Amino acid sequence: MSMLRLQKRLASSVLRCGKKKVWLDPNETNEIANANSRQQIRKLVKDGLIIKKPVTVHSRARCRKNTLARRKGRHMGVGKRKGTANARMPEKLCWMRRMRILRRLLRRYREAKKIDRHMYHSLYLRAKGNVFKNKRILMEHIHKLKADKARKKLLADQAEARRTKTREARKRREERQQAKKEEIIKTLSKEDETKK
């Protein structure tokens, strides 16, 4: 059997693959051995004496199946863990994600005029100070603040209305008393005139 090392190298160059992927027909070794140029190798490829082997199948089916199981929480117990909790899910990354979510929410609320810039600033600093565990708690806090603000405004309006009402009542009472005084003075002066 003749050495076909040259032919294999030329074929791998022509087919643009590794030498392992080149198949030379064992029944036609003499004809292949005569080919010593790329042009002749191309002809042999065209005739089907030299073939590029297909890519070896490396199935990901099992891997996909395991990934789906892991999403459900399987194979993730204490015995399967190698790194520390911080190595598996860094605290800094969790913090960054939380801050970005909270700050995005605050920005949107400010742009939509749901909160004013003063409330935005105080809530921004509170978020930075680790007051809000997640988005839901921040939203609930904002709703509570707004409700308190509305209630205070309502109470203030009611108190103001009560004050104006009492002020007007006092004014009316004073006017009535003044009118009564004037009437009494008039009647007294008339009586004095009649006596004279």
Curated annotation (Swiss-Prot):
It is found in: Cytoplasm. GO terms for cellular component: cytosolic large ribosomal subunit. InterPro entries: 60S_ribosomal_eL19_sf, Ribosomal_eL19, Ribosomal_eL19_CS, Ribosomal_eL19_dom, Ribosomal_eL19_dom1, Ribosomal_eL19_euk. Residues 156-196 are annotated as: Disordered. SUPFAM superfamilies: Ribosomal protein L19 (L19e) (SSF48140). GO terms for molecular function: RNA binding; structural constituent of ribosome. The keyword Phosphoprotein does not apply. Residues 159-196 have a biased composition (Basic and acidic residues). Belongs to the eukaryotic ribosomal protein eL19 family. Component of the large ribosomal subunit. Component of the large ribosomal subunit. The ribosome is a large ribonucleoprotein complex responsible for the synthesis of proteins in the cell. This is Large ribosomal subunit protein eL19. It comes from Danio rerio.
